[in-house]
Amino acid sequence: MQYFKVVIMKKNQIILVIIMLTLIVGIAAYSLWSFSKKAAIPVREGWTLSWHDEFDTKKIDSEIWTFDLGAGGWGNGEAEYYTNRPENARIEKGMLVIEARQEKYEGSYYTSARLKTQDLQEVLYGRVEARIKVPSGLGLWPAFWMLGSDFDGTNWPDCGEIDIMEHIGKEPDLILGTLHGPGYSGALGKSQWNRQNYNIADEFHTYAIEWEADQIRWYYDDIEYFKVNRTDLNDNKWVFDKPFFVILNLALGGTLPGPIGLDTEFPAQMYVDYVRVYQK
């Protein structure tokens, strides 16, 4: 009788072990499936993915991105010194982090980073999108934008500029989309303010343009809020029929956001989940 009790106990233990192993394997498989599902790039009907960066590498991909370096205001009276140091730009937990810091560096009192795809990955027509979490604070100026590939040999604004997203820290519920070109630049640029009823910096949002030969449309979380047609420029030249390169940066101070606030918290981070370019 005692023998049978021992056998039954051993069988129960074996069954319990099998159940536990099954649960462990199942959880591991589900986790792997969930990760793969999260990492999958959604298919956009009618579009083909041309190039992208999911920022899932250990370092910033030098085959996609290079850096603008230095200070001098960048034509806007900005206060930062742009570097390529990991303190200012790095990959962290599957995201690009652009970090603005309050520190004395090369004669400036602030540092940040400005990444670009110039001469590496350029775009002529298509959908250009990024999922970004912007920082908030007086004087912060995160942006996702593009310049014409002939920028180095052509005066601005003749090269053309497409501002997919600019966020001004002093107005946390607001983003701006703008088109700059010859005769319509700076304060005369073709632009649209897009105001929300919440702080945009609280969460990630998707910013995009869809660019065609005669029209550019702006999107915020897949909702169109602005468009410019070639015919809207009247006698001014449409310069958006050539390749452009992508720029991601976090500026400090300058003409648009105004002075940096005394209570603006540093370091301040701009997080970029991905950049994707689709074409038809």
Predicted regions mapped to residue ranges:
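Short, Lys/Arg-enriched N-terminal segments with co-localized hydrophobic residues
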Residues: 1-8
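GH16 jelly-roll
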Residues: 12, 16-19, 29-280
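Hydrophobic core
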Residues: 23-27
